[in-house]
Regions:
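Active-site and substrate-binding clefts of carbohydrate-active enzymes
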Residues: 33-279
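His/Asp/Glu-enriched short active-site or ligand-binding loop at hydrolase and phosphoryl-transfer sites
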Residues: 18-31, 155-160
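A conserved hydrophobic secondary-structure block that centers on an alpha-helix together
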Residues: 1-13
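Short acidic/polar capping segments at secondary-structure boundaries
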Residues: 3-5, 27, 53-55
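Short alpha-helical segments and helix-capping/turn motifs at coil-helix boundaries
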Residues: 5-8, 31-37
Length: 279
């Protein structure tokens, strides 16, 4: 799944030239632990930057900034699909929402300054679709955060720059698999509710691995089958039987391609163009 990590990936990441990854270790270290502010060095691979869930929750969590009353309600439509309601059900006022975004930006920067008062790096990593999509005023909020950071004296940096000034400590032994998803683990993609998706993808992976020189088409069908969206949609019951249908179609297409390479029209040739000639 996206944004997932397991220690056994370290050597592969190292070979791929990945210097650093952002990981979710809240379950291992505890919410708000100061250990989240220091990079960790894995034994066999890249630098681990720990996303700071306590700060991320200010914008991403239940009751975070986007839920405040003046903001535009993403889910409330008129007959003609216009969004004209605030979160609290009142009539939307863009001026008031902009004012709220600036106030929330000032509050956010103040919270981060307090978080790193004694040093360290706060990694605020989110799905950027939140900004401007789910949270209409999110882009204005981010713009105001940049202004507030300058005004309040909060240094903004990139991870490449930060690694030059922050010494990494060894990662704790025994880290398991983690993700940015529900529960900080892999339950959304391999829990009992979606076990069939996980087993089907694994069986397909083994079948392809046992095939000498599999075609590019076969590799692409496997990638499409392994898409984390199918299990996610099924686990959250967001799209009826569509994810099951899509996963099954890719599994069947892969099986046909392994049996009779090149005999069937490909509908995934645009996926992962870098695979051309890989095998």
């Amino acid at each position: 799944p996206e944004c997932a990590y397991a220690p056994w990936l370290d050597p592969a990441l190292e070979r791929a030239g990945v210097r650093a990854v952002c990981v979710e270790l809240t379950n291992a270290l505890g919410l708000g632990s100061e250990r989240h502010l220091q990079p960790m060095r894995s034994a066999d691979g890249p630098l681990l930057w720990l996303i700071d869930r306590a700060v991320i929750a200010l914008a991403w969590g239940q009751g975070g900034y986007p839920s405040r009353p003046p903001y535009r309600d993403y889910h409330a439509y008129t007959t003609h699909r216009h969004r004209v309601r605030r979160i609290d059900g009142g009539r939307y006022d863009h001026v008031a929402a902009t004012r709220q975004a600036r106030a929330d930006a000032a509050e956010f920067v103040s919270a981060v300054r307090a978080r790193v008062r004694d040093g360290g790096v706060c990694v605020f990593a989110i799905d950027t679709e939140l900004l401007g999509h789910w949270w209409y005023e999110g882009v204005q909020w981010l713009d105001a955060v940049l202004d507030e950071a300058d005004r309040q004296g909060l240094a903004l940096t990139t991870l490449d720059a930060a690694r030059e000034h922050h010494e990494a400590v060894p990662a704790p032994a025994g880290l398991g698999s983690t993700s940015w998803g529900e529960g900080g683990d892999l339950r959304t993609w391999s829990g009992p509710k979606v076990a069939a998706f996980a087993w089907r993808a694994r069986a397909a992976e083994l079948a392809l691995a046992a095939t000498p020189n599999p075609s590019d088409r076969a590799l692409r069908e496997l990638l499409a089958l392994q898409s984390s969206d199918w299990a996610f949609l099924a686990d959250w019951e967001l799209a009826g039987d569509y994810p099951e249908q899509r996963a099954q179609l890719h599994a069947e297409a892969l099986a046909r391609e392994l049996r009779d390479p090149g005999a069937h029209e490909s509908k995934v040739r645009g996926l992962a163009p870098w695979l051309a000639g890989w095998s």
